[in-house]
Amino acid sequence: MEPAAPSCNMIMIADQASVNAHGRHLDENRVYPSDKVPAHVANKILESGTETVRCDLTLEDMLGDYEYDDPTEEEKILMDRIADHVGNDNSDMAIKHAAVRSVLLSCKIAHLMIKQNYQSAINSATNILCQLANDIFERIERQRKMIYGCFRSEFDNVQLGRLMYDMYPHFMPTNLGPSEKRVWMSYVGEAIVAATNIDHALDERAAWAKTDCSLPGEFKPELCVLVGAIRRLHDPPCYTKPFLDAKSQLAVWQQMKAIESESVSTHVVVVEALKLRENLAKAVQETIAYERHQYHRVCQMMCNNMKDHLETTCMLARGRTLATLADLRSTRYNLALFLLSEMHIFDSFTMPRIRGAMKQARCMSYVERTISLAKFRELADRVHNRSAPSPQGVIEEQQQAGEEEQQQQQEIEYDPEMPPLEREEEQEDEQVEEEPPADEEEGGAVGGVTQEEPAGEATEEAEEDESQPGPSDNQVVPESSETPTPAEDEETQSADEGESQELEGSQQLILSRPAAPLTDSETDSDSEDDDEVTRIPVGFSLMTSPVLQPTTRSATAAASSGTAPRPALKRQYAMVHTRSKSSENQQQPKKKSKK
């Protein structure tokens, strides 16, 4: 318990024993750092309390060679009663001596009380700092235990294997036998081994988070800085003036020999002594007021700010650590879910996908706050993407698409009046070339009863035209190395005559048009190939085109054999080329002249 502020009378009755007892009382109320406070912080606080107390002037400097030994009981009684002799104009040597001794004793006691208040203020600041350090590190210890308990219950004790053990029944394929289940579980163990690096990285991050949440490294230097700041803030008011005034007055009395001189009245000495004692008491009161109120309030305010900072830091660290814990738990759960989801689709690509994803996620587990399930699957897709079609599947799809396209083309019914495309015409010519030629004797005479005979004869004429290509009006006839025989010339003439008679008898209007000139590439291909491919002229028109007669293989075969034709799967068109007799006669002499 701190002593009350002294008055003038308290200074008069104080003695050395009471002052020493008060000092021992201050030492008994000291607060010391606990074991939780780090050693260097505790030493810093205790050293600040043992520093030399500020002393502007020592008692010897203030009182000089004056004797300031303890007074006797009789002298104490006289000192306490000197105020009763203020109006005494006589010269009482005993009273004057008691007044001078009271000034000396007041200076001694005031100096001791000021030093004691200095020490009390420093001890109080040291106690505040020790209590602050104890509170801070006790709060940090509670926070550490709380965070460690959270990690232990929600992360350390819930390892990857434990998670997968709790979750694997939901992901095991249902169609596995006992032996297959054992094989599947062995592969699950391999997947856990592949993910060990990621799990260790999560454990390391958890250890870092635990270290950050303990916060001793942050508050150790801050406490040391606070101790030095509080010690430097101790700046009590100056107390030297009343002591110097007392010293000068004592020197005057000594020079005047006021105690022995009869000329110096008791009234003058007593009044001056009471005035000096009052000034000393005021100095002591000011010092006590500063130490107990101003300096103590400043120390308490700084320590409270430190406590508020501690609470704020602890809350932020707790939130940050719990957020890290949630991220680590989420990453570990996503890792277990990824492994089991991959094992659920158990094929030859499962283990390569898992190993590749674990290698790529190794660095991410240290850098990223959390790794989602989608990220794990994305890393696995970089190794092998199950959703992407395989090369064999692409080939099969292309083949299937080709078959469907061919089937659609077969199902299309062409309009008889629609001219064939160039590609279809080439395919039809090739099919016509592959068909065996119909025998004229079996097919019957020209212009017979049946309707298939004109189509058969037209096909034979088309084949003869292909076997014996003839140039158009604008085309140069190349010289042939083979010379036709007379028998062939006669057959050609008879066939042309029969064709002209048949066309005249059927009353069909055929508008002949000269064929378009062929390009150089077509001329070259005609010269190189043995078989001529019929092409659509450049100036083609339905009104001036050759007659299109639909024919099929079944119809041709039926016409040659005399049987009924089978239904055709696809319409085929043959170009019926008509030549005038004059052009044939013009070409025939050329061949004969060549011969």
Swiss-Prot record:
Main location per the UniProt record: host cell
Per the record, which residues fall in region Disordered? 384-595
Q: Which residue stretches does the UniProt record annotate as biased composition, category Low complexity?
A: 392-401, 503-512, 550-567
Q: What does this protein do?
A: The IE1 protein has some additive effect on the trans-activating properties of the IE3 protein.
Question: Where is it located?
Answer: Host nucleus
List where Polar residues composition bias occurs: 469-484
Q: What GO cellular-component annotations does this UniProt entry give? A: host cell nucleus
Bias kind Acidic residues: ranges: 402-416, 423-443, 454-467, 487-502, 521-532
Q: What is this protein called?
A: Immediate-early protein 1
Instruction: Kindly list the organism's lineage.
Output: Viruses, Duplodnaviria, Heunggongvirae, Peploviricota, Herviviricetes
Q: Does the keyword Phosphoprotein apply?
A: yes
Q: Which keywords appear in this protein's UniProt record, sorted alphabetically? A: Early protein, Host nucleus, Phosphoprotein
